[in-house]
Amino acid sequence: GAAAGASNSSALAFGGEVAPPTGKTESYDGTSWTEVNDMNTARYGQGGAGTQTAALTFGGTPPETGATESWNGTNWTEVNDLNDARQLGGSNGTQTSALLYGGTPTPGGTANTESWNGTNWTEVNNLNTPRWRLSGAGSDNTSAIAISGRNASWQAAVESWNGTSWTEVNDVNTAVIGSGAAGNQSFGLKFAGETPAPAQQAATEEWNGTNWTEVADLSEARDRPFANGSRSSALCSGGYPGSGTSPSWNATEEWSLTDLVGSWSTG
């Protein structure tokens, strides 16, 4: 699934990899989750952008789709599709200015990038490193960072988007797939994800526009969480705990930055 929202007290989570894939949508007010109207197309592995009351979702599977839907705070409406159907790409932005990059079904991941202007998707310049199961953060379709992921192997690579092209910047400390991300091109977070071993991660890294720094861990290790917010106020909810029964299936954790020190707390 995917998420939208500006902070740890205002979020929208939609879709997800359950059996069968779901179109369910839930809204978070900082205290509790409330079910609202479903998406038109049930799916997982899609992109997400926007806020709790003005969101966008695009792509996903099964099968790989280019379907795009817009949320007005009450209902989802089908709008113009992606040019290339795909799942498990990185995404960021707003309901009217969004970006999607990477993903599958191309073997080893695609480098394709598409930009949304509120009406149509346009193919723009590709990532330098093709990959899938990456994460992304950014304010709109002119400013983004593409984080980690994999192709033939796990990638620590990070790329910065300026509205025209991608530039390689400093790598994350730990290469992961299926991580959550929040923030923007200059101030961001990467959290959770999966490594070859010991698999699901609780690690969090903070981005200052130049370097990544390891900071406080999540309470629950997981990958593929719903993620939204900013570097100072982020939300990590749901996700895959790896095996067995775990609170990670529905656990919500809130990130807060106080006096330049960040920490997670149970939502």
Predicted regions, residues:
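Polar, enzyme-active/binding microenvironments
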Residues: 1-267
